[in-house]
Regions:
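Conserved functional micro-motifs across diverse proteins
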Residues: 1-201
Length: 201
């Protein structure tokens, strides 16, 4: 639950699914159309662990591959206008970020920048990604991206659905940022003030 002087935001539900049925037939983002297999479920994502070469004596090398399931994360969120004035063209944004938690401290990480003993980055062939939502249920032909609520009268609430496709092995470390700044790879002042939603609780 997040609020400021004008708007409050409440996460009503977060659902995790193997398919895109929650979106309906006509609302699937174009970049997700190839992510569904013949059985109707999301296809697996092939991760390739890369050892980078120096470009002179050695080239980039795939040291191992791994197949992981992709999952739909579907968040239902309610925005409420707490002010005395109508709010027009309200930008809304949800971002997922990944955090490690150890010894009381949290650190944001990018899964493509993970490294190990024999690799220094990870790439994959699926559509899985965190950061900004790929699907949103309410849009307005306004601004860049269309993720606007056209009007919210004083005291009025509106429910919005947002969705991402993610790698299943990242779910335990996934947090939802709804403060509107879109931060996903570093802590922002507004994020630290409003907090995050642990979606896997």
């Amino acid at each position: 639950y997040i609020e400021n002087d004008k708007i409050s935001v409440c996460v009503d539900a977060v659902q995790v699914r193997d398919n895109l049925q929650l979106l309906g037939q006509n609302n699937v983002p174009e970049e997700w159309t190839d992510a569904v297999g013949t059985d109707g479920n999301l296809v697996n994502n092939t991760l390739s662990y890369i050892k980078s070469g120096n470009g002179i004596d050695s080239v980039d090398e795939i040291v191992k591959t791994e197949s992981v399931k992709q999952k739909l994360v579907y968040a239902t969120v309610t925005y409420t206008n707490k002010s005395d004035e109508e709010i027009n063209h309200m930008l809304y944004i949800g971002t997922l970020l990944l955090m490690d938690h150890e010894d009381g401290s949290y650190q944001i990480y990018d899964p493509t920048e993970q490294s190990g003993d024999d690799y220094d980055r990870v790439i994959w062939d699926g559509v899985a990604r965190t950061a900004e939502m790929t699907y949103n249920s309410i849009s307005e032909d306004y601004g860049n991206g269309g993720n606007y609520i056209s009007s919210l009268k004083p005291g009025e609430s509106i429910q919005v659905n947002m969705a991402w496709i993610v790698n299943e092995n990242d779910l335990n470390n996934m947090y939802l940022n709804l403060n509107g700044d879109g931060a996903a790879y570093e802590f922002s002042d507004s994020m630290l003030k409003t907090g995050l939603v642990d979606i896997y609780q």
